[in-house]
Amino acid sequence: MAQEDDLRALGKIMDFLRAVSIILAIMNVYWYCYEAMRMWGVTIGVVDRILINFNRTGGLFHSILYTKLFSLLLLTLSCLGTKGVKAEKMSWNRIWTVLAVGFCLFFLNWWILLLPISHFGNATLYIFTMTAGYICLLMGGLWMSRLLKHNLMEDVFNNENESFMQETKLMENEYSVNLPTRFYYKKKWQRGWINVVNPFRATIVLGTPGSGKSFAVVNNYIKQQIEKGYSMYIYDFKFSDLSTIAYNHMMNHQNGYKVKPQFYVINFDDPRRSHRCNPIHPDFMSDISDAYESAYTIMLNLNKTWVQKQGDFFVESPIILFAAIIWYLRIYKNGKYCTFPHAIELLNRRYEDVFPILTSYPELENYLSPFMDAWQGGAMEQLAGQIASAKIPLSRMISPQLYWVMSASEFTLDINNPEEPKILCVGNNPDRQNIYGAALGLYNSRIVKLINKKGQLKSSVIIDELPTIYFKGLDNLIATARSNKVAVCLGFQDFSQLVRDYGDKEAKVVINTVGNIFSGQVVGETAKTLSERFGKVLQKRQSISINRQDVSTSINTQMDSLIPPSKISGLTQGMFVGSVSDNFTERIEQKIFHAEIVVDTDKVKREESHYQPIPIINDFKDADVNDCMKQAILDNYNQIKEDVKLIVKDELERIAGDESLKHLIQK
């Protein structure tokens, strides 16, 4: 009740001020249009004397503007105290337009009184313009009172609520990767840092093609880790993008290493720029389980659908058969012919020759028993199916160039050996990714076993476009490599790729055990998963209720997504969201980030302008400086075939001459 009385009293005061304002405007017209007023017979003697006294004592009419200014002042005060019915569509543009028109008509009409026309004409025009101007000023003032003071549509994308303070301090150590950033907070762009102080807790880099994950993140990982003396294994899907960076950066930053690192390349497309390496070298296979692991890796890389069918009869059979062949080559003549090409060639010999040879060795007899039972039992269709499921996928890998690279060893795969640190780049080709990816998967599995040991150098495993190869043991490497100083960085487009190619269970293990994550633009389930990972934060919500008499504003808080899926789906190139992990001794209060990773493009261009191509390793020149690459590769291919023919011939002769074994040969 008291509030209503106060409002009524305020309304009366505002009406009084507006009335005085109108009287002042009328006084202005009466004084400056006096001749017209006298002609119309509306002059009043008492009013004349009052106005003359005002002018004599206060100089009210010394200028035509004085009464107008006082009138405008009182009009303004009356409008400020008026509570109008709020209108959502009312805008400042509309108000300023009306006020500008009113100001011009009200104040800039003095020249009308000087026009060489009759007093009647002058007064009529002056009164009309002044009245119209006053009405416009009154409308503008009243509209201002109806304007909503809080425009809830200023921030339609909720940028202010979803911006947050991020890490601004550089935290660097001997292992860290540090990326400068720009982030938006409190209507300003701030400078900050993404501090990956513990890269050994593994890193995932996500993003659709063109989101900048290689340029902004992966390239920086390679450069900074080389500067800090990491040995390195790089899977370069689009060879030689990453390899060229690694080679040139290593050549320019060798002072980070106690022992000068060696640079090695495996490239099936260009043997001139490729070293040779046997991934099943006998020195690194001490047990038949190592042979099984190699067979398992190669088969699942050739048949990605088998990943989710592990344990099935027609999945295990070819793996067992190929594992037996690899282990046979390991024990035959102390591993002299233990190479991947020799294993493929031996598999493609007649099974009537291969089975007796393999079963003549006691350690392989049980491995081959299912095949021997089918053969001796006459189940030829079953046997043919088992053998074909091994031969058909592996036959895709019969290539002279691939045989050349994989049939000899110019270096070993223990890249983090303190005495011989290495930077190894293996190159794939998008046009041949299924074939090359299978062979490179073999290198992956072997390297994982060799580097994940104590007492070695700190090392980095960088896999670009992870789904293009099956990386056996990846989940175990992430889970256990931290104590052995192995930093893993995985780049791919989204989680659905990983689920498709690695299976739901293994993909979930990889996703949930990684400590550092960067994500450019991703959509769908991946964006939802990331949003849930980043959690919720307390956000302010404001609502306005409008009625005829008043506007009520309510402000409340609620928990909402810190970075919603819609934000992640709409990230521009170079913008990343993610989180990092910290250490006991290096605490990071704000682990989550939503920022643009700042890359000095001018510096990058200067560096790239001085890059040298990866050098030729083998020029394949004969004594007369003729190019003999094709012939050398073909000779190697034919030599492997001859080696296998000789092995089969010698072994069958041995079995035939041994009374205890000759029963294995079926006539």
Named regions from a protein language model:
Residues 1-211, 215, 220, 546-548, ...:
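Basic- and hydrophobic-enriched, low-structure N-terminal and domain-boundary segments
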Residues 25, 42, 149-153, 194-486, ...:
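P-loop NTPase motor domains
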Residues 52-56, 166-172, 438, 465-468, ...:
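A short glycine-/small-residue-rich loop at the edge of a beta-strand within enzyme catalytic domains
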Residues 75-78, 82-83, 441, 445, ...:
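Hydrophobic alpha-helical segments involved in membrane association or supramolecular assembly
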Residues 169-189, 368-381, 516, 522-523:
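N-terminal short leaders/motifs
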Residues 183-189, 303-313, 541-558:
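Low-complexity, polar-biased intrinsically disordered regions enriched in Pro/Ser/Thr/Gly
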Residues 478-480, 484-487, 491-581:
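Conserved ATP-driven motor cores of ASCE-family P-loop NTPases powering translocation/secretion/packaging/pilus
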Residues 592-595:
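N-terminal charged/capping segments associated with class I S-adenosyl-L-methionine
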